[in-house]
């Protein structure tokens, strides 16, 4: 029932954003319904090729690629039961596979069905092939402890620090609708061949769905990610406030595992450094489900601010022409005021060597762009409301601070955004992917000096005027 309500609300939101005439056609021609069932396979030699019942090299969920980097990668997946696992990988075009096992305290770990293997020592900008292996211990099966090697061979490419031109895809606030929305979103934004993909938080639906974290994360979006690109291209998943609730919220970190145990990261490809932050949620007991959690939110935001200061000293920061910050919640014109004391002193740096160029966020379900030094929102005229009360009230309730020196872009509900990266400019587009015939909610160009150029006619929205006080 809850899922039906969610999808009904989603459809209603789309219809509300379009006129009745425009809403009649639809980009939706199908949806995906995930089922756990047996599948018949026609085979000339079934007796030889049927998989052994203890062969768990074909995952129940996954595999998925995480943590894009020049010299490492993370592969995650879920098996049908707890078992020992590993990854065999090789540089494409070579014969011999290297093997990495999942071990715990020096011994092979047979206790898990959710797995993450971190590969290290890779070459930049290089294509690798990989396959999964599995094994049961003698305490787990009376029949065999054979080591099974996967028949399926997947591939991925490490980050290339010298790559000049490429595209990345971003979405936000997908709220568990991927089985309906993700295919047309990718197609209608032209993102089939993006180098990597970002989810900017609120990936699951509802406030308490991380009570059943695996189900809502996997069926909500990751199964579809793996179906479309996730086995072969990196996905970066950030945590939103809806991903930060429920007694299984820690499973988010188990599924999207990092070798350093953090939920923030940065990596550079070509001219652009991508900086991914975890904005968590408002550090008050009524939001954070407990006094200790509220305290930890402050600790973790402070830790990220210190990490940003150190990142500014790194070669990747110094070599980048563009610095793109990504998070679920922005610092102003929305509910992110609690973030300002931690991040604004670090991010709002006017110097060429210290500046960021754009901060792209979600959460508000209301597209807008705020250019440096302005206190107004921009949106493509073709999609601007004649009565932009929501935008005006947002700026009135959550004022834009003085002296902001970078661009902030806030995505729509089920945002579909692309960044075309070149050596000399970033071209950022918010696509009206759910509209038959397409269109752009916004498009702009950002140059290394931080200047912004509109690429479509835009409407500028100023804050709602303050009401005069009665005498």
Feature annotation, model-predicted:
Residues 3-8:
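Sec-dependent signal peptide recognition
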Residues 11-19:
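Hydrophobic h-region of N-terminal signal peptides that target proteins for export
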Residues 21-170, 191-193, 319-320, 421-471:
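Acidic, histidine-bearing metal-coordination/catalytic regions of metal-dependent phosphoesterases
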Residues 64, 129-155, 211-313, 342-355, ...:
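Extended active-site neighborhood of metal-dependent phosphoesterases/phosphodiesterases
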Residues 77, 128, 173, 197, ...:
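Divalent metal-coordination and catalytic microenvironments
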Residues 164-238, 243-244:
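Conserved, compact domain cores that house catalytic/ligand-binding motifs in diverse enzymes
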Residues 174, 325-330, 357-369:
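Histidine-centered catalytic micro-motifs
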Residues 204-207, 312-334:
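Short acidic, glycine-rich surface-loop motifs adjacent to enzyme active sites
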């Amino acid at each position: 029932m809850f899922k039906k309500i969610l999808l009904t609300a989603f459809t209603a939101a789309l219809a509300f954003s379009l006129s009745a005439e425009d809403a009649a056609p639809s980009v939706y021609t199908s949806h995906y319904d995930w089922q756990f069932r047996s599948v018949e396979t026609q085979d000339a030699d079934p007796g030889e090729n049927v998989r052994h019942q203890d062969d768990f090299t074909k995952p129940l969920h996954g595999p998925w690629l995480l943590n894009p980097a020049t010299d490492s990668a993370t592969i995650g997946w879920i098996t049908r039961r707890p078992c020992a696992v590993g990854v065999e990988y090789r540089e494409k075009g070579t014969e011999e596979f290297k093997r990495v096992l999942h071990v715990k305290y020096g011994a092979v770990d047979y206790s898990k069905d959710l797995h993450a293997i971190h590969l290290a020592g890779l070459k930049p900008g290089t294509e690798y092939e990989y396959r999964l292996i599995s094994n049961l211990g003698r305490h787990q099966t009376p029949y065999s402890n054979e080591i099974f090697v996967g028949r399926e061979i997947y591939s991925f490419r490490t980050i290339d620090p010298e790559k000049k031109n490429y595209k990345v895809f971003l979405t936000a606030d997908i709220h568990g609708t991927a089985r309906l929305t993700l295919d047309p979103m990718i197609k209608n934004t032209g993102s089939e061949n993006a180098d990597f993909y970002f989810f900017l938080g609120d990936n699951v639906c509802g406030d308490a769905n991380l009570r059943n974290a695996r189900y809502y994360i996997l069926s909500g979006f990751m199964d579809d990610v793996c179906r479309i690109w996730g086995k072969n291209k990196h996905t970066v998943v950030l945590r939103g406030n809806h991903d930060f609730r429920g007694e299984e919220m820690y499973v988010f970190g188990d599924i999207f595992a990092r070798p350093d145990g953090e939920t923030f990261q940065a990596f550079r490809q070509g001219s652009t450094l991508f900086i991914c932050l975890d904005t968590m949620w408002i550090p008050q007991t009524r939001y954070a489900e407990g006094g200790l959690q509220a305290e930890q939110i402050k600790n973790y935001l402070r830790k990220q601010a210190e990490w940003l200061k150190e990142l500014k000293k790194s070669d990747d920061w110094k070599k980048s022409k563009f610095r793109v910050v990504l998070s679920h919640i922005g610092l102003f014109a929305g509910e992110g005021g609690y973030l300002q004391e931690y991040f604004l002193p670090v991010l709002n740096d006017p110097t060429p060597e210290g500046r960021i160029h754009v901060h792209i966020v979600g959460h508000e379900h209301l597209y807008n762009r705020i250019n440096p030094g302005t206190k107004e929102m921009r949106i493509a005229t073709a999609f601007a409301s004649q009565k932009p009360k929501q935008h005006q009230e947002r700026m009135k309730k959550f004022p834009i601070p003085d002296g902001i020196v970078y661009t902030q872009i806030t995505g729509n509900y089920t945002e579909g955004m692309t960044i075309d990266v070149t050596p000399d400019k970033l071209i950022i587009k918010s696509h009206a992917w759910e509209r038959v015939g397409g269109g752009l909610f916004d498009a702009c160009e950002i140059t290394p000096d931080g200047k912004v150029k509109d690429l479509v006619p835009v409407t500028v929205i100023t804050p709602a005027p303050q009401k005069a006080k009665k005498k």
